Amino acid sequence: AHIRVVSHEVNRGLSAARNTGLAAARGRYVWFPDPDDRYDFTFLQSVYNSLQQHEAPVVMVGHVEEFYDAGGKVKRVQEFTFSQESAHLGKTKLRKHVLEFEKGTHYGYAWNKVYERSYLQQGGFTFTEDLPLIEDIEFNIRVFQDLPGLNVIGAPLYRYAKREAGNLTSKFVPRYYEVHRARIEMLRNQLDSWGLLDAGAKATLGALYARYILSALERNKQKESGMSGSAQKE
């Protein structure tokens, strides 16, 4: 059969579900779309065309972020595309673009990428469980560490839904600051291992770090945090 359904008896979270699906997969490439998102009807055809032009272990596409209010209405739309419409990047070139990908919110997601299953298997790549918010970027940093090549499709073919209610990124997460500090540290270590941690990279990482600090402070002020005034100051 072309379609098989696999499930967990109890909800073990996103990473565990992806790992189970990855273990059950038989196709050459795997994709991890979120169930409440949408994508252009040409998404898979565009990925196929890209791979026909140049094989690669990973294909990354542009995306649109749709911000929904509590009533389910779209209140804002933002596109995230690449400077090039379509391209193949070898190991050296893709490494030089990683920080640009992170700034453009491309690097940290799994749903905007299609992965060659054999490459994931050979590298032993699976998603780390019980790692809120940064499971995708942690996975991608490991996958990209020795990635020999990457195909990029500039068109925004994936539509990511960000909702005021129900989306993990909109919920209060007690360890928000700690996990994003870990995110910056992982990026720093990767760039350093590639010999790309120059002054410009440090400045960019510093700006990203400052953004996460401000975001953490804002979240601590939310009533959902349950934090007292003294706890917020700490």
Where on the chain are the PLM-derived regions?
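Acidic donor-binding segment of Leloir-type glycosyltransferases
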Residues: 1-7
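Glycine-rich, basic loop-to-helix element that forms the pyrophosphate-binding segment
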Residues: 8-25, 35
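Donor-binding/catalytic cores of nucleotide-activated saccharide
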Residues: 14, 35-153, 158-177
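Generic N-terminal leader/processing signal
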Residues: 16, 110-111, 221, 231
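A generic secondary-structure signal
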Residues: 20, 46-50, 186-193
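Residues immediately N-terminal to the Walker A/P-loop in ABC ATPase nucleotide-binding domains
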Residues: 25-26, 52
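Short aromatic/hydrophobic "clamp" motif used to bind/position activated sugar donors
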Residues: 30
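C-terminal subregions of glycosyltransferases and related glycan-biosynthesis enzymes
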Residues: 159-234
